[in-house]
């Protein structure tokens, strides 16, 4: 995009705009096909009204990642594992969460190698081991982008773990006991070390982790194992760092939350009304923090 539009900010906004449109269509399809007919538009509404939705419009990676990840999921649903692998590879090239997506796709390949949108459970013939192996081998193509990135980092820095070390140095992210992580995050959210705006952001982080854990539990109870794996890995990675950081942004990538909310609102209208009444003012606050140069997650 920068080749066509020389201004970096405008290029980033255009990429987010196009990718966001693709992601919105794909999310609507997943909600309609995998969750409940008639919930597609509502799921998209809840995504774009979420607390961290500002980052979908800004020149960040969330919209582009979702465009690749959601279309990869739709391809896997049809049993097109090559397309799913290529799209998941694109997601992996953009964010490390693409590896979590790949793990979820691997679980889906083991359970329904022919795809789960081609027939009902009763109509679908039993999967053969060869089908599962073929699907899993095909998905390995998604590892090519992160593998090349690791090779690039090794050649550039001489360190295979350069990315992890940069995360630790720049963002204080390293594997930490989740109990210690929770305590540190709680202190940051409700202590007196930071200013009120920073406290507010950390309070959102705590709520976001709670929402993520609840989503994992609900998905596991409903035996949606691929989505459970993806959500659990995403939340687990952020809940075992030094403190909770950028979790509301990570929730943007968890389509089961938005699809699940849409289903809940279809059953009980007050659920959606309450969500929007709380989320929209928070989203506006986050946008204002970002545009005034404050930390916004």
Please annotate each region the language model reported:
Residues 139-143, 267-296:
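Signature aromatic-anchored transmembrane alpha helix within multi-pass, membrane-resident enzymes
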Residues 69-74, 82-108, 141-145, 235-238:
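Membrane-interface alpha helices of multi-pass inner-membrane proteins
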Residues 5-22, 198-205:
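Loop-to-helix entry region of an early transmembrane alpha helix in multi-pass inner-membrane enzymes
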Residues 27-49, 83, 225-229:
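Transmembrane-helix signature of polytopic, membrane-embedded enzymes
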